[in-house]
Amino acid sequence: LCSMSCPMGINTGDLTHIIRQKELPQGSMGYKAGNFAANHFAGIKSALRPVLGLANLGHSVLGTKAMSCITKGMHNVLGIPLWTPAMPKAYSIKSSQLAIDNDTLRNKNADKDSAANGQLKVVYFPSCINQTMGLPKKSPVEQALASKMIALLQKGGYEVIFPENMEKLCCGTIWESKGMLDIADRKSAELEAALWKASEQGRYPVLCDQSPCLHRMRETIHKMKLYEPAEFIYTFLRNRLVFTPTDRPVAVHITCSMRKMGPVSYTHLRAHETSQDL
């Protein structure tokens, strides 16, 4: 929120990117590492899942207290990232199950007015984090965000489409944050081409479930209509699903990227419609 709060509109995030760009020029080891990651992104994500699985196995065997002590010592000695009980388990989207569910949905819609239901498709691009990381071991929620999003879309009658080669795609935020702006733009261009094809040249809406990712996508992709979850639900699913308000309190955290994009009102409207205690 730095630029929104500053009377001069100064964005310290952009300044940080410029400084990092100077510190990591092309040819530096850091830049080469970033370029390697961009070119082998699918492999890096695939390699991360076993690491998360191993950490979850260790947590299950050792328990929280012992796991915390051991990993804290490893962090102090080896400098590895600090483990916490909130670390997520590995996750991957089951494309085969999605295909079966889409076929079932397609057959169900065929019994109705095909002209009305033929357009009920959405291109869903889960963020890299939500493609790779699931829930913590002791999470009170049973379904990972991507699985829950797919189930909600299909419940609303929408066939879910993923862009081709989704494992290697990224909006570029990772590299933008490190000052590698040319690599970030290259990844954005790859994503735009894949989404353009998947949406049949903008015929179907595109949904992304992570607001910082969507913020960058909206800055670099202009040929398609891009939605975040609350906005998509309010626009397309509100009249196709029955929402029953709960008495449980709901906490709403609005990120700075959401405030910049403007769909905050949709989030508040959805929250008010689903909970009496906001």
What are the residue ranges of the model-derived segments?
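Cysteine-centered iron-sulfur cluster-binding motifs in ferredoxin-type domains/subunits
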Residues: L1-I10, S257
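Conserved AMP-binding A3 loop
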Residues: L278
